[in-house]
């Protein structure tokens, strides 16, 4: 039993005569019924339990008092009389189920080192001192303040923390968005390099300027700052640091980044993913290659023309943490058609990273090209866009891909001749400069392949031969670094897909190739294909779609582009009917 019991400091305690006692805080309230509690309240101010009994002896027995004290302590309404501490601070720790005297002791025992890069640290240190956090000037940093999370100094902080196995907290108090976190914990969470990889991808303009113009530090984007906004950032971070010291952990920020958008007061949590092959905290080197072990998977969702092992709702639930404008593999997932009237459902999922850029003009064009997804329902469209975003992210070259330098002859029959995949003609190669000058980047014709050149090759698995083959790494991954004079190929997203399982992804990627094959045979040969009797399907959604398009001055129809493969391939085409130009727009699909 507590020797000097008193109500926890965060409670407002008030007697309601004849009814009981109310305990009130900003997060909870309790009612203590009975005259005994009304009698005890005035004396629960840090006196000893024996003194409380003595004060009430004329009205109630000591046994009743001790029993009531035991019940109040069991329900966590009481704490021990505390040493001198500001009432507000005592209440704060008490509301977190931490005895104020315990908080004071832990704050005094554990020193905190603060480092700052590009921002002032003095006001932040002052806030920590006001919270009784013990500060130290020497030693590795526990907290790092910065005006940009890609500053070069942070790489050294990260390396030292990984070497020592020491956690540290990143804070960005400047800018429209205040960042508190992540709390990096070596061996458990991702590290700063894991964060930096995602930041470079999600802030491509800053990353481009840093690489193009040779900035020694990060390109500082977060210039918005006033004494008031900085105080918000410092205050949030100071409370987090004090809580970390007292509790010994900070699960709210461990492997997580909290942002506060000051104009809107929107608070968001962003998950930091630990990258398995991170060069700083992961396995490093090449991720190796193993032939895929395919297995039978039960299809549980076959609506909307797909074959999936789970419903789209579950796909979103499993992978939603990958969506973040800061730490996400997919920076956003937003509806593209707010006036879809419940019929058209289209989402965008960030920029299309399948197109490499080398100039500012190409970057500008790249930023306007988005990943997207569609569906007959809102959920299907969101899942579709998310999977396309993850697909494109997964195909980006990062340096840990399995590959080996070799000349084609050194690989023998295992090498797939590059032009068997590219299929460019001799005329196209001869006239490539002229054709490239007037064509889009999607129609880029590379330098003719030199089989004597030593390049990097990556292993792939042949499903038809059941053996390992090799393709140029540049053909397999987006953004593979190569000089212009040795650009024999670039990666293409045709046949790429993401799925809930490996088998599901393979099926979806294969169907995309079947679709493109059917379209190419139809388009380039200019052959006539039969129309599709859409009414024969008896599908209500098609009726709703037709009515929606008619209301917007458009019509649509479908062509059957199925080839000798026997897998249905359709072209869905829509055009304006209320004037010129017709704005003809086709869409294609293949499904089993």
Language-model segment annotations:
Residues 1-5, 10, 14, 20-25, ...:
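Helix-coil modules at protein/domain termini and other flexible surface or pore-lining loops
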Residues 16, 136-139, 171, 194, ...:
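Conserved beta-strand termini and adjacent loop/short-helix elements that scaffold enzyme active sites
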Residues 17-19, 25-135, 158-159, 170, ...:
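Long, charge-rich, low-complexity alpha-helical segments
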Residues 127, 141-235, 243-249, 261-293:
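E1/E1-like adenylate-forming module used to activate ubiquitin-like modifiers
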Residues 133, 166, 554:
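Short glycine/serine/threonine/alanine-rich loop segments
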């Amino acid at each position: 039993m507590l020797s000097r019991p008193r109500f926890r400091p965060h409670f407002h305690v008030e007697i309601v005569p004849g009814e009981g006692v109310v305990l009130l805080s900003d997060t909870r309230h309790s009612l203590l019924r009975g005259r005994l509690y009304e009698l005890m309240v005035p004396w629960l101010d840090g006196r000893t339990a024996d003194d409380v009994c003595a004060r009430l002896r004329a009205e109630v027995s000591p046994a009743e008092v001790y029993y009531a004290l035991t019940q109040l302590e069991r329900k966590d309404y009481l704490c021990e009389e505390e040493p001198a501490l500001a009432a507000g601070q005592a209440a704060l720790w008490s509301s977190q189920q931490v005895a104020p005297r315990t908080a004071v002791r832990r704050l005094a025992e554990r020193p905190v080192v603060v480092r700052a890069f590009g921002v002032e640290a003095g006001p932040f240190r002052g806030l920590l001192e006001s919270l009784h956090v013990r500060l130290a000037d020497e030693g590795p940093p526990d907290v790092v303040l910065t005006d940009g999370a890609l500053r070069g100094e942070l790489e050294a902080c990260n390396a030292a923390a990984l070497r020592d196995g020491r956690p540290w907290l990143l804070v960005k108090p400047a800018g429209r968005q205040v960042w508190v976190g992540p709390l990096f914990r070596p061996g458990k969470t991702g590290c700063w390099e894991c964060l930096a990889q995602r930041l470079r991808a999600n802030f491509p303009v800053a990353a481009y300027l840093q690489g193009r113009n040779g900035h020694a530090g990060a390109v500082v984007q977060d210039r918005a700052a006033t004494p008031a906004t900085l105080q918000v950032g410092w205050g949030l971070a100071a409370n987090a640091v004090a809580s970390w010291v007292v509790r010994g952990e900070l699960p709210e920020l461990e492997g997580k980044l909290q942002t506060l958008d000051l104009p809107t007061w929107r608070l968001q949590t962003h998950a930091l993913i630990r990258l398995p092959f991170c060069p700083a905290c992961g396995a490093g080197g090449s991720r190796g290659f193993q032939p895929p072990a395919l297995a039978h998977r039960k299809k549980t969702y076959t609506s909307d023309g797909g074959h999936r092992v789970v419903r789209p709702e579950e796909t979103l639930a499993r992978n939603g943490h990958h969506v973040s404008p800061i730490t996400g593999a997919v920076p956003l997932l937003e509806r593209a058609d707010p006036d879809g009237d419940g019929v058209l459902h289209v989402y965008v999922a960030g920029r299309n990273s399948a197109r490499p850029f080398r100039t500012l003009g190409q970057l500008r064009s790249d930023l306007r090209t988005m990943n997207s997804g569609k569906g007959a329902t809102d959920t299907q469209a969101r899942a579709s866009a998310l999977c396309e975003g993850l697909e494109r992210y997964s195909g980006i070259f990062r340096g840990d891909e399995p590959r080996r330098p070799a000349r084609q002859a050194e690989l023998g029959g295992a090498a797939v001749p590059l032009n068997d995949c590219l299929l460019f003609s001799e005329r196209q190669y001869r006239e490539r400069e002229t054709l490239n000058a007037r064509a889009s980047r999607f129609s880029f014709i590379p330098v003719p392949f030199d089989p004597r050149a030593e390049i990097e090759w990556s292993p792939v698995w042949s499903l038809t031969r059941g053996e390992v083959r090799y393709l140029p790494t540049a053909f397999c991954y987006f953004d593979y670094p190569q000089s212009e004079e040795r650009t024999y190929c670039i990666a293409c997203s045709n046949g790429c897909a993401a799925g809930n399982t490996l088998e599901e992804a393979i099926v979806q990627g294969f169907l995309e190739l079947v679709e493109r094959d059917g379209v190419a045979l139809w388009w380039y040969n200019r052959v006539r294909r039969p129309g599709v009797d859409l009414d024969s399907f008896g599908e209500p959604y098609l009726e709703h779609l037709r009515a929606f398009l008619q209301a917007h001055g458009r019509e649509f129809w479908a062509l059957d582009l199925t080839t000798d493969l026997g897998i249905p391939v359709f072209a869905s085409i829509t055009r304006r009917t209320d004037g010129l130009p017709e704005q003809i727009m086709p869409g294609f699909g293949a499904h089993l």
